[in-house]
Amino acid sequence: MAVAERLSRTRRGQEIVVLERHDGFGRETSSRNSEVIHAGLYYAQDLLKTTLCIRGNPMLYELCRKEGVPHRKTGKLILATDKSEEQQLQGIFEQAEKNGVAGIRLVSGKEIEALEPYSFGLSGLYSPESGIIDSHQLMKYFEHTAESRGTTMAYGTEVIALEKSVDGYVVEIKDTDGEQLQLESAVVINSAGLWADRIAWMAGIDVDKEGYRIYPCKGEYFSVSSRHQGKVGRLVYPTPSTIHLGAHAVLSLDDRLKIGPNAVYVDEISYQVDEDGQEEFYSKARRFLPFLELEDLAPDMAGIRPKLYRKGEPFRDFIIQEEGERGLSGLVNLVGIESPGLTTCLTIAEEVDRLL
């Protein structure tokens, strides 16, 4: 949606059509997440995930202020609960400093107690530029603005084939009634989320050889009893693991509290939360949120991340690639856009515009 809004502004007079197989925007990864505005702490400074996040953070706050998109700059605490995590936290701090993250600082256990009296950490890392956003209202803004400039939102429309032609691409689509038709376009932007590898494959790219294969990774959330509302005022994270940032205290704009997400690789797309995970969530979260009791947690929601690597494989960056060198001029692939995809939506849109 951010790409459509950007191009509707910079390429006025060109016909832009958004093809979406669901009956509205944001039915998958874009809405099923923690809705966090990240600051760019974790990853190496030369990665797209870092550079786009560092630039995207202030841009997104500015858009929210200007356009009235609900958000809150809560700040974020990453907590170390043992000595080994303290060493790991030092590494995150040093990386964040290299990345140029504004206001980042190490905090002591006493400072943690002052900032978040119901949380526990031997020490921590405080990021004042992290926050939360209403992702639905953000996407609604993108939709409304793009449509006001003439963009067509073709909901209930699934891409079933994509073929290079002399002048661009022939895109075969199917609607909810099963009717099929073909569109011709000079440019195709593949931002299909969990299905981006399938679109790339349709275009003739060997997704396994080129590293475009997506491995769905499920993240589940458990809600916290309303009796604890107000006990957490910031995003509170554990020191992260190797494949994700860790199940953390997720705040909503109305101050409801959730714990999540975990990270479970799956073969099928299902958004059902496994109730048997309650004890694991509880045992992990209670290390840094000691006020929790097992009965405080209830299954809430789940999302699926489009990861580019399997469990145990090396970390992979976003793929944002114009495919002219493969003989596919005018095709831009956005593959593996997981966290911090929400924070980087504006800078990803800028990058796509630049590539075109």
Feature map (PLM): residue ranges:
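Active-site substrate-recognition segment that forms the wall
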Residues: E5-R6, I37, V69-H71, Q182-V187, ...
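Gly/Ala-rich phosphate-binding loop of Rossmann-like dinucleotide-binding domains
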Residues: A4, S8, T145
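Helical element adjacent to the flavin cofactor pocket in flavoenzyme catalytic cores
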Residues: L125-V187, R198, L346
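C-terminal lid/capping helical subdomain adjacent to the catalytic/cofactor pocket in oxidative enzymes
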Residues: R9, D23, F315-L356
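Glycine-rich FAD pyrophosphate-binding loop
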Residues: S8-R32
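Glycine-rich phosphate/pyrophosphate-binding beta-alpha loops
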Residues: Y42, S130-I132, P240-H244, V332-T344
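Short beta-strand to alpha-helix junction loop
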Residues: A44-R55, L79-Q88, Y126-H144, A154, ...
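Dinucleotide-binding Rossmann-like beta1-alpha1 core, especially the glycine-rich loop
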Residues: E35-E111, G121, G246-A247
